[in-house]
């Protein structure tokens, strides 16, 4: 039987009648001293401090407000610089206390895969859950704990178990790679349609976008597609500056804080870089978040573009990163509102034209799981690094003869994605298989989307 000796701990601060904030601060100091004095073994001051800070931020119940250790601050810096070692996923986790989504499972969820990375190549999608990392359940892990395990030296592997549609479970041993986060890609579709892909909003993204728009202007494009799918956001100011390239007046976004003097309204300032006669389609999905939603709403609410795709992620809060010596923290210090004065946090922005690839049937889901578990696509491409159309068709027929139930179009896309990744030759856009892009092009050319 354990022997428990009860000591009475009465903080002097209770007798002093201090205000609550200062009172709790003094209690914290006294608690630290009490533990260090009476705990049977030696106690590490830094470990106590970090534990207390993490508990403080956890008590807020906001997944975007977190205490960050020195290592986590370094990782955040690597991400901001656009390069780190990992698998290539933006992830999130909501506390059960927040009540964000009753149907949401208590695991880390993929916000979006980063293009041209190991996770992207394997077909990981926005909305997939990460239920295990290296065999350990993520249910009780913090977001940072999961991220820390997934990151590592390029060339090493991490085992990740995913859950899709709440009934497809699959595990990959993923080789970590040097993850570079490109923010802008651009090209022409059919010579007169500009295609602008923004994958995230870094500090230098506006310069890259301006360069692409200047090139489009020289080519005298008639239409423009801005693709913000699987864009997790980034720097608020970058989204505002880019919105200004398309608007000559009107509100871009407003930010409201607890401190009234911090409230700001950002207006367009006549820095338009593309002709107002060019109709614009903006592609969005549930992986479009934060700054991507700001740009989408700014263009849509001001009548400059039509949104096509799926309802966005729904992150309408603004965080600031602050340092505490070598440690630091990220705190939600405001919420942003669209030009129509709507905060889309936990709601998202619906498209004006809903388009998405159809969901897989139960039979197709089972076939997809089988392909993943048996690495069939990867093995085929390893044996046929540059397969001909005939070889791909023959492979597809072989899969079907073995009981794989899936459209030829989907199987062909899986093969081509693997080939492109292995050859480091991913196309800027995919008009053959991308049904959302196909619809955007159709609507632009038919005149359903008009310049405003």
Labelled PLM ranges:
Residues 185-225, 229-452:
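C-terminal "post-core" interaction segments
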């Amino acid at each position: 039987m354990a022997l428990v000796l009860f000591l009475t701990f009465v903080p002097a601060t209770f007798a002093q009648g201090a205000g609550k904030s200062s009172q709790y601060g003094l209690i914290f100091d006294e608690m630290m001293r009490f533990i260090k004095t009476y705990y049977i073994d030696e106690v590490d001051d830094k470990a106590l401090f970090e534990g207390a800070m993490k508990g403080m931020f956890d008590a807020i119940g906001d997944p975007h407000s977190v205490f960050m250790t020195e290592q986590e601050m370094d990782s955040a810096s690597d991400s901001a610089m656009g390069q780190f070692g990992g698998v290539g996923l933006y992830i999130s986790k909501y506390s059960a206390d927040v009540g964000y989504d009753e149907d949401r499972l208590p695991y880390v969820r993929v916000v979006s895969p980063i293009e041209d990375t190991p996770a992207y190549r394997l077909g990981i999608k926005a909305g997939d859950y990460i239920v295990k990392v290296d065999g350990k359940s993520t249910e009780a892990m913090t977001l940072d704990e999961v991220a820390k395990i997934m990151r590592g030296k390029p060339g090493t592997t991490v085992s990740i178990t995913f859950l899709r549609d709440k009934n497809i479970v699959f595990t990959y041993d993923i080789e970590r790679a040097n993850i570079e986060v490109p923010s802008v890609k651009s090209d022409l579709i059919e010579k007169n349609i500009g295609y602008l892909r923004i994958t995230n909003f870094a500090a230098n993204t506006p310069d890259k976008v301006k360069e692409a728009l200047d090139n489009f202007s020289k080519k005298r494009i008639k239409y423009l597609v801005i693709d913000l799918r699987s864009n997790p956001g980034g720097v608020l100011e970058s989204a505002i500056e880019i919105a200004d390239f398309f608007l000559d007046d009107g509100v871009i976004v407003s930010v409201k804080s607890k401190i009234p003097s911090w409230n700001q309204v950002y207006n367009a300032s006549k820095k338009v870089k593309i002709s107002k006669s060019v109709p614009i389609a903006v592609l969005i999905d549930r992986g479009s978040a934060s700054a991507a939603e700001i740009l989408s709403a700014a263009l849509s609410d001001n009548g400059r573009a039509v949104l096509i795709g799926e309802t966005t992620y729904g992150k309408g809060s603004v965080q600031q990163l602050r340092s505490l010596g070598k440690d630091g923290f990220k705190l939600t210090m405001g919420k942003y509102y669209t030009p129509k004065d709507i905060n889309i946090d936990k709601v998202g922005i619906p498209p004006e034209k809903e388009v998405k690839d159809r969901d897989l049937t139960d039979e197709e889901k089972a076939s997809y799981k089988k392909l993943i578990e048996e690495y069939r696509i990867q093995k085929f491409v390893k044996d046929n690094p540059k397969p001909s159309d005939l070889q791909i068709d023959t492979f597809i027929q072989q899969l079907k003869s073995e009981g794989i139930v899936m459209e030829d179009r989907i199987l062909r896309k899986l093969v081509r994605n693997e080939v492109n990744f292995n050859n480091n030759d991913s196309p800027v856009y995919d008009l053959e298989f991308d049904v959302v892009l196909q619809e955007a092009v159709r609507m632009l050319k038919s005149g359903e989307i008009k310049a405003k």
